[in-house]
Structure formats: C-alpha cells, structure tokens
Amino acid sequence: SEAQERHNKVKARVMADSLVGLIKAASNVIIMGHKESDLDSMGSSLGLKAICDNLNKPASVVFDPKSVESKTKNAITTLFSRDDINRIMVSPHDVMDKLKSNTLVIVTDVHRPSMTLCPKLLEEATKVAVVDHHRRAEEFIESPIFTYIEPSASSASELVSELIRFASVNPKMELPSAYATFMLAGIYLDTNFFRAKTAGMRTFEACMILKEYGADNTQADDFLKDEFEEYALKTKIMSNSSTPYLGVVVSLADPKDIIEGATLAKVANQTLQIKGVNACFVIG
C-alpha cells in the first residue's frame, strides 16, 4: 500500500543515518556475506563498500575464491582487474589481521553466523551490523549494534541501493558503475527477473537508482546466463522428475554429478513456471 511504501522509505532513511554514524565512528570496516557467494551477496557488499569509500573510511570485502558461485566469480573477473580485486577484497584467512578494537563488521544477505564466510570474525568482533532480506532464523548473530532485516525486500542489493540513496548528501554519493551493475545482477537473481512475489515498487525504484549510477542491464543479464554445461545439467535433472501428487513435482539429480545449490534452485524456479505446478522439490 502507499502508506506502507512511505513507512518503508522513512525506515530506510533512519537506517541509512544510523549506519553512516556507525561507519564514521569506526576505525575501519569489514564487509562480509554468506558462503557460496552469489551475485546479491557480493553486489550488496560492494554497495556497502561504496558508502564507506564516500565517507573516506577504509573498508574491505571478505571474498573466498573457494566458496563462490561460478557466475559471481565470472562477474568479478569481468568487471575488475587483479589490482582492483586485491584493493577491494580480503580472504577469510587474512581478514583477522584487519580486525581492531574499533572495527565495524557489516554482515549482508545473511544473519546466521554459521553461514557467513568467516564465523570466527563474528566471534572476535565487538561491533557488528546486519543488513538482510531473509526472515529471521533461530540462529542469529549475537548482540549486533545495528540490525536492518526487511523480509519484504526482494534482495540485499535492493536494501543497500536504498541506503545509498538516503545516505547521499551534497555532493551526491559516488557509486562506481561496475558496483551498480553487480548490484543490479543481484536483484535480477533474487527476483528471478522480477517474477518473485517480493518484487515490488521498491525493487523497481532500486533498479532506477542503480541505472542512474550507470548500471549496465545488458551486462547484468549476461552474468546470469547459463554455461552450456549448466544448461545440460538442468535439463538432465528435469528429465528425472515425477509427480507423486497432483500439482507436486519431485526432481532427482544424479548422485554422481557435482551440482551448485544455485543450479538446483534454478531447476525449481523453472519447474514452478509450468502451468499447474504448485510445489516442487529438487534433490541433489
């Protein structure tokens, strides 16, 4: 509703002001997403780094080359040089060296400690902020000083786009076009190209914000395209499907195949687009 939209914008503005205050008060910032980093986790991390950069606060994004989805890795190598990667990112192995008594750790697109790229970092950190769009689980980061969880949002990149918009003062906040493209790809991913129920007015406004910063929607779309091997794997899984009940489809992957969780999710999304299918279970 219109009233709800107004409420969300007021909340986003308040959250942006609070987060900016915490970043300014910190000695440095470490930004961390979840294991098997996807485009939304990394995109929202880059957006948060841009906020820190505009506030002249040293910030690093935790990145593990061994725990990243193939599409995310492809986007990183396409948009950034090796020097850029070394400047922006830090490995889970080296991140503890950057943790000081006044460091702010911002966790994005996840709120379960066990699912983060470096759970040890959360055990040692004294100041932790959480930005997430998933419904709160029983397992939660202990005593964060800032929590922005909005299940009505389509993605973490949508939330961070709003934070960038409302954190902007004169002069306008800078967001590199590569970061904006990454964030747009994250929104595409989590909304399944705006088909998800969580895609609303705020989602399209977030995309508009990112386009203003030079996001390349063609390139963002390319990042989500399947390699031939993945396409063949999806087709193979779908061919091994059964319908135990009316409107329910169960698809089984070959135990010999090594399959990313994102691929299983895509098979489920694709199956749910078939008329008459109300529920789908993909096991692999």
Task: Specify the residue positions occupied by each region the protein language model found.
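Hydrophobic/aromatic beta-strand patches that form the interior of the parallel beta-sheet core
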Residues: I106, A129-V131, F146-I149, V249, ...
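Short acidic, glycine/serine/threonine-rich loops at helix termini
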Residues: M42-S44, T72-T77, C118-P119, F140-S143, ...
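Hydrophobic helix-and-loop "lid/oligomerization" segment in the mid-to-C-terminal part
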Residues: K11-S37, S41-I88, P92-L104, L189-G284
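Short, hinge-like loop/turn segments at secondary-structure boundaries
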Residues: T77-R82, E124, T147-I149
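Short alpha-helices
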Residues: H133-A206
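Helix-enriched interaction subdomains in cytosolic or periplasmic regions
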Residues: S1-K11
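Active-site cofactor/cluster-binding pocket
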Residues: I88-S143
